[in-house]
Amino acid sequence: MKSKFCFALSAITALTSLALSTAAHAQSQGSWLVRGGIMQLAPQVNSGTLSAPTLPGAQTSVSNSTQLAGGITYMMTNSVAIDLPLALPFKHNLYGAGSIAGVGKIGDTKAIPATVMVQYRFGEAGALFRPYLGLGITYAKFDSEHSTATLSGLTGGTPQTPTMLSIQSKIAPTLQFGGSYKIDERWFVDGAITKTPLKTRNTLSTGQTLDIELNPIGISLGVGMRF
């Protein structure tokens, strides 16, 4: 009877030690954090004017886009991490603004941001909530640009040779503020806000150009697992 009690006590002690060890090292050095969820990109547009020949004061606005997203984080120390956000391409519509406000959609594009972040996570490795700050770099690639008949009509395109749109891909810094909330010793909820000061140029096949500040704000929310 005594030997059974000692065995049970030893087992409970071992399990308790393991649980405490896991809690203490939930986001410790060497841990991998994988998450999945959604993200919205909201461009904060400051549009230049389209160069001639076109209507003076022609500008553009850009729609928000929401997509499935996630990311992978590696804890280099208990507080410093490397984060790789991941997402499907974001489709954005372009609309007339300025002197051509009200003409409707003039084009669309897919934005494919590739970002790597260095994060500093506050608090202890096993804390229930860990806010973090991140600084990184983003390569914003624009692909699958399409223009509409409206844009052709405004810029001198024809049905036979419609105006084609090209958006310059750019590299820009990205700032991040977020937080991770521990559900249990393996699962967590993660939310973050990013800001990227991004300026690019639209070039039309008819010769016009338009410089635009997109400066997108990204808002993400996901559920993740620790490994």
Residue spans for each PLM region:
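Short glycine/proline- and aromatic-enriched beta-strand/turn motifs that initiate or cap beta-hairpins
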Residues: A24-G71, R226
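Short, conserved structural micro-motifs that define repeat-unit consensus positions
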Residues: A69-T73, G178-K182
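Gram-negative (and chloroplast) outer-membrane scaffold detector with strong preference
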Residues: Q40, Q44, G71-L151, P216-F227
